[in-house]
Amino acid sequence: EKAIELDPNYADAHKNLGILLRQKRLLSKIEQAKKSEIKKSYKSNLRLTSNPFISNRKVEAELISQLYKINSKKLDDVDPGYLRYGNGKSSDYELFENNFSTIKTVEKDLINIMKKTVKSDIFIMESFFNIFQTGSGIISHNHIVNFDVTHGLLDQKFSLTYYLDIGDQSCDEPGVLKLQDPDREILPSEGMIVIFPASRNHSATYGGKKDRVMIGVNFYSLI
C-alpha cells in the first residue's frame, strides 16, 4: 500500500495488492462453504467428470471484437523470457472486470459450466485472453503457486481454456493444446471449452497466418 501512496501508477504494487485481496476473499469463501456444508473428500481427478472435461459454447460474433478493444500487452512483454512468447498479445488477469455486455454474459455462462463441472460453487482468481499470431506460443507450465501449496488448495484449483477463434490450422503448428501427466493432445475447435486441474502441465505452439483467440480462467472449487 505504501508503494501505491508514493506512486499511484506503480503497476506492480496495484497488481500484488489485488492478488492478496482476491486470495483473502477466496479463503473467506472457502471457510464459509465449510461451515454451510460438510466438506466431502474429493481428489482433483475425481471431482471432474473427466480429465480434461470438454464442453462447447457458441461464440458471439461481437465477443472477439470487444476483446480487441481491451488494453493488452505484447506477448514478449507479458512474461519476459518466461512463459508466453512471439507475435501476439495478452490482457491482464482481470478480464471479467470489464463491463462489455458480451463479456459479462460469457463470464456468467462460464461460471455455470465451471460450477457444474466441479460440483461446487467456484471462485475465479484470474481471467484473461491470449491472441496468438504466427510464431507464438506458451511453454509448458501449470497454474499452481505457493499460496495453493501453503493453504492445501492443490486439489481445488482448476484451469479453463475457451477457444473463440482457432485461427489457421492448415500449418505445421496449428495451436494444439498439449497436456501432460498423462500426455494428451487436443486440437481446438471454435467454441471448445477445456477444463483440467491447475496442477497439470500444458503448452501450445501456433504457426498459423490468422489470429488464434482464447479466454483463460484459473478458478477454485469452494468445497
Segments the model singles out, each with a brief description of its role:
Residues I30-S120, G137:
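Non-heme Fe(II)/2-oxoglutarate
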Residues K119-Y206, D211-M214, N218-L222:
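Catalytic core of non-heme Fe(II) oxygenases with the double-stranded beta-helix
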